[in-house]
């Protein structure tokens, strides 16, 4: 027999096991023989590892080990009956071919390599694939499951030498941490060792306890007594430094100081707060201090130099610093206090990394000069807003309870402590000046009054004496809100209009454009968030009248801390959308990866949803055209892989009209748009998308192997998607879907063409009824080319209530086969069209059919005598058909393998391209690395939809052809040769009879007797007995010939009828429903990719 070499697969392990051209000569022939009739799961590491890494122990490349049976055995999981049970409460245990134990957590997509593995690993399932069997040496299953795992299983592996050129671009693991500070780490180790020694030696603890007691006794209740604290620390140090237990500690004094501080902090802090009681800084009276009051230098700048943008950035730093300084109240040591203080000043001055939103801002505060006076003024605001109640106590502690007095005088900590001291002095000096206090009180009271009038709790919407508040109109609260912003938030629109019209010099358009809160919200964003559409329209009118197009685009696309523009907050504001839509950057994504169009599409609670969606889409389309491009659907996919189709609630025809649209695209959970619609019962969307020819109805969710039918809980939804299934079926007549279990009884939903009022009907039928129907049809058509016995057997195994991925694949395969089978039966009119209206109709038809079958006369009562000429004619007819069927079967075999490999090699091409791109980006040479970014290729020669449909039809046609060929083969090579054998024996008996009894016309009956003479009678009796024996043999041979001939005749008649049916089915299936459909679908889908 000729050896056909199929193309090599990219993954060496998959190729070694499934794609061996000569299994009898392969080094894996024993493994192939062992697995010949077994079902198994293959664990496949990524091709990147198998092709580019080698085993540490053997030094062999991993791709060479893929042809080593000992290596392969660990990757093959044998399947038992338990493999089909979905154990949500426990893990699924499997045994490898060499007896090792593997546990799979299907829910988490995790594999644990346990008993037998010398390296126990936790592996991640990257992808689950169903591989159609294309070889001839595995007979255990038509499909095999491959679990692609994130790394090799049973070996230590390292990259090959040639990967060294990629070394500098190696990926950093997600869980990798920065290198620790060795000095800090060493000190922590010493501290841990120090405390362990103290706990091991109670005597030492007792001595230290006595020192703690002496401090609590000697120190006055209102005096922290730094000198007493330092004295007992020194006393402890003197007693320990000569002790051999502590001689190896390089920082013994610091360790002792910290230990004493830890144990005496509460006592020290209590004395401190008592000591400064009545003298602490009271920040309540400065509650309404604002940036404009302290940073007078900024506000006194010339009009051309002053930028409100600088103030908004200062506000953000103030907010961060204030939040951080609040942690000071939670500290319990000098180290903690000093750390908080330094970090607060760093956040305030901008010397540390701010949040990502601030880092991306252009011309930020980092470019501003931050002198000491400015820093102190800002720190005053930080203290006021953090509401610190024991500021002097913290300052005193920082100045007096350090283990190194120089640290508070020099360096960054010294600067921080002196800044805090200056702030405390500021408050003290401020309180000593009665004029300042009076002015502050007046200003505070005035600010409070204005804010009360602007409060949402105040019903009035106007301020009669607005002029009296002119000097505080530049006030900004701790959230960074200006007076106009507060008016907008609290819907004080009349006051807002008064302010903007009467005090235009204080609020020029430039300031309105730069007015932002600490979270980056502009006035327009604030108005939309507050639902103040009137204020929004006022602002838009001002902007449109006073700003250039460039300024409008810049302002409308400003983002807040969530990277949202004003358009991301639009839900039902139709008029506003129309007025600013042309200035929106429709491709701008927020922190969740959502564009404005995406946000509008998923705002489901708006009353005019469809109109809003249509308007937004039209405006976005216009915006794309304005920028000389076509609407790009891929621009609007969020960080979770959701597309516009996934989130659109209704009116999806506006998207389905797009040409470059993947309507089967999966999000990161593996859900297609149709699955989402089915899950949330969006009937109008289901109706629209099921009419689109690009839809792949049974797209499988990779992690669970669910299809859209698994998410359907409603009969109307099942009926709707079932109708599409009928249209996609082989002859468009019937479709089996949605297998369910009720007390271990399996039922299936069947959608079929109906003659009633509705064109389709969906019914629930018990699988046992389907099984009985198949048996009844098989009795009527024993030579049918449909493999009914196979389906009957598979239905018998449907007794498992919960199915894993393995079971689901079997169920899906069975439902597909039943769909094809009953499509053919209906196409050939073997069963009535209205049979599946309900289960009672099926049972009734089966009873009637059985009754008719029992009334038919049996062919055995009148066997037909066949002549050699007739047998020759039958033999010639069957041989001709057998040769044709065999040739066609071989062609189908080749076509099936080609279709499988087109899909496999497309995936290989994609994986190889991704791997090449990934490696290219890691190249040390930056110029060479950048060259890989420009590689663009299209590996999709055929659409996924058209390939899947054609492969399924070819596989079914091949099964039918094999079934019919086996019947022809039995008659042609067993029954007819047997007839010729008996016919030859019959002729030989006749020849022997004529030779022995030439005068006999025909053999005598055994009952014929006559009287003879004694001697002559004896001879005659012997002669008659011989003649009778031959006569009996001739009669038996004749009877056998008649039975065989009758059996061949009946089989020939039925086979002739079945061959006619087969030819009719084959032509319709292959020509119209397969090749033509494949070409049509493929052309239409690929045209959209051009």
Curated annotation (Swiss-Prot):
GO cellular component: early endosome; late endosome; plasma membrane; transport vesicle; tubular endosome
Domain VPS9, chain residue ranges per copy: 289-436
GO BP annotations, alphabetical order: early endosome to late endosome transport
Gene Ontology MF annotations: guanyl-nucleotide exchange factor activity; SNARE binding
Pfam families xref list: VPS9
Family that this chain belongs to: Belongs to the UPF0507 family.
Record's protein name: UPF0507 protein C1Q_01007
Organism: Saccharomyces cerevisiae (strain JAY291) (Baker's yeast)
